[in-house]
């Protein structure tokens, strides 16, 4: 092997292959992280509930399913979900051609990613302080 070729191989960046679904999850995550403030709630259990409820209602809206609005919390999460679903339809038109099953998988992956980024990966101990 020539020295020039070996140097070129060393400089080459190696990246793990990314699936189309992961790429889409990245796009949607990026939108939330750069545009919306609800992911910055001060306690981990509130963040977890918000992620679950807002993204569940967003999925229901994107799939044309009924959304539970029976409590004031449901209605609060629904408002964020309506805005998010509308923005996703506008900024990411590929979501409009996905099946309900694909949207369900996409939104579950998005919830998992948001939980990781906003709860599980963080070292901020205030997030889990029971007295905060």
Swiss-Prot record:
It catalyses: N2 + 8 reduced [2Fe-2S]-[ferredoxin] + 16 ATP + 16 H2O = H2 + 8 oxidized [2Fe-2S]-[ferredoxin] + 2 NH4(+) + 16 ADP + 16 phosphate + 6 H(+). GO terms for biological process: nitrogen fixation. Keywords: ATP-binding, Iron, Iron-sulfur, Metal-binding, Nitrogen fixation, Nucleotide-binding, Oxidoreductase. Hexamer of two alpha, two beta, and two delta chains. This is Nitrogenase iron-iron protein delta chain. Its EC number is 1.18.6.1. It comes from the Bacteria. Transmembrane segments: none annotated. InterPro entries: Nase_Fe-Fe_dsu, V/Nase_d_su. The key enzymatic reactions in nitrogen fixation are catalyzed by the nitrogenase complex, which has 2 components: the iron protein (component 2) and a component 1 which is either a molybdenum-iron protein, a vanadium-iron, or an iron-iron protein. Its cofactor is iron-sulfur cluster. GO terms for molecular function: ATP binding; iron ion binding; iron-sulfur cluster binding; nitrogenase activity. The lineage of its organism: Bacteria, Bacillati, Bacillota, Clostridia, Eubacteriales.
């Amino acid at each position: 092997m020539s020295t020039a070729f070996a140097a070129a191989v060393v400089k080459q960046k190696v990246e793990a292959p990314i699936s189309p679904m992961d790429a889409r999850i990245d796009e949607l995550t990026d939108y939330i992280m750069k545009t919306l403030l609800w992911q910055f709630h001060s306690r981990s259990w509130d963040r977890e509930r918000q992620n679950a409820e807002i993204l569940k209602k967003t999925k229901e809206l994107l799939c044309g399913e009924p959304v539970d609005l029976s409590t004031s919390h449901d209605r609060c999460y629904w408002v964020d979900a309506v805005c998010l679903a509308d923005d996703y339809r506008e900024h990411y038109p590929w979501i409009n051609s996905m099946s309900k099953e694909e949207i369900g998988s996409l939104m579950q992956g998005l919830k998992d990613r948001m939980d990781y980024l906003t709860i599980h990966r963080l070292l901020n101990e205030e997030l889990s302080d029971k007295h905060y």
